[in-house]
Amino acid sequence: MKIGVIGGGQLGRMLALAGTPLGMNFAFLDPAPDACAASLGEHIRADYGDQEHLRQLADEVDLVTFEFESVPAETVAFLSQFVPVYPNAESLRIARDRWFEKSMFKDLGIPTPDFADVQSQADLDAAAAAIGLPAVLKTRTLGYDGKGQKVLRQPADVQGAFAELGSVPCILEGFVPFTGEVSLVAVRARDGETRFYPLVHNTHDSGILKLSVASSGHPLQALAEDYVGRVLARLDYVGVLAFEFFEVDGGLKANEIAPRVHNSGHWTIEGAECSQFENHLRAVAGLPLGSTAKVGESAMLNFIGAVPPVAQVVAVADCHLHHYGKAFKNGRKVGHATLRCADRATLQARIAEVEALIEA
């Protein structure tokens, strides 16, 4: 089976690494000449709206999937004429636009911060008055890793904020005094079978994920599964989806979904019986899903901007290095380390060792 992937970054790379043992081959459509997944399959170098090369991809593969959600709707519609596409167009339409996403949460009865559509500075002024400050102004599309957003703490911050984000459609979200950030990675098969990985505790730095620690018997696991299950069923979703939540007053409030394999699920490569990457491929290919059970105590640390010396990273016991082969650049995810340990105390010690290498 040959899988087409829109995007050739590290997520596409890790999909290929997981799919090769299953006998799968890959073709990546990505305009970047240095796409880091290119060495693991065919690289069709073209823009995401280039219909000639999209048709070439469709003709060569058995199905198409995505490594990011900001795919032009026209691209999805065009590909769907010629080849199965997973996840479906509706899933991408909802997930790429924060207004549609938040509206879906509300329709499904999933708690989420107060929000308002912002199409102008006047809209922002009215929304800030209604929701109150502090609040977060976000572009409706394209923002990720802390980009495309601005925290508004006082009235002076509101003035000119719409222009600061490019005068594009935005959403204002009420600030949530959360006690923690967690995410749930789930996988849904073509026949609707659904499996969930353990909830993960996430730590961010300047909006970029820094550390994910897989939980054991989290008291909110069942609630998170309920909320995620509602979304998967509504979208008739196929593949892996990640749902990020805020922990608030002993419950959960929805932050956002990602209709793809997700950074907070990287720990599953060594820390679960079947990784998120393999399970995504199993789902879209119509294969039986793998077990999402955790193996040992696991965590993932991102390498942002640079990877510490390889010899030092692999010298840490229970540590597995994943180097993306990308040029080092401030703010860029260029690799990660996964840790799988026998117990929680050992895991915390190993996290501290890797953090020391990152900070050195």
UniProtKB/Swiss-Prot annotation:
EC number: 6.3.4.18
Coiled-coil regions listed: none
Domain of life the protein comes from: Bacteria
A Pfam entry, by short name: ATP-grasp
Domain ATP-grasp: 102-285
Entries under Gene3D superfamilies matching the protein: 3.40.50.20, ATP-grasp fold, A domain (3.30.1490.20), ATP-grasp fold, B domain (3.30.470.20)
Catalyzed reaction equations: 5-amino-1-(5-phospho-beta-D-ribosyl)imidazole + hydrogencarbonate + ATP = 5-carboxyamino-1-(5-phospho-D-ribosyl)imidazole + ADP + phosphate + 2 H(+)
Any one GO CC term of the record: cytosol
Pathway entry: Purine metabolism; IMP biosynthesis via de novo pathway; 5-amino-1-(5-phospho-D-ribosyl)imidazole-4-carboxylate from 5-amino-1-(5-phospho-D-ribosyl)imidazole (N5-CAIR route): step 1/2
SUPFAM superfamilies (UniProt xref): Glutathione synthetase ATP-binding domain-like (SSF56059), PreATP-grasp domain (SSF52440), Rudiment single hybrid motif (SSF51246)
An individual GO BP term: 'de novo' IMP biosynthetic process
Molecular function via GO: 5-(carboxyamino)imidazole ribonucleotide synthase activity; ATP binding; metal ion binding; phosphoribosylaminoimidazole carboxylase activity
Family membership: Belongs to the PurK/PurT family.
Subunit structure: Homodimer.
Name of the protein: N5-carboxyaminoimidazole ribonucleotide synthase
Annotated organism of origin: Pseudomonas aeruginosa (strain ATCC 15692 / DSM 22644 / CIP 104116 / JCM 14847 / LMG 12228 / 1C / PRS 101 / PAO1)
Organism lineage: Bacteria, Pseudomonadati, Pseudomonadota, Gammaproteobacteria, Pseudomonadales
Gene: purK
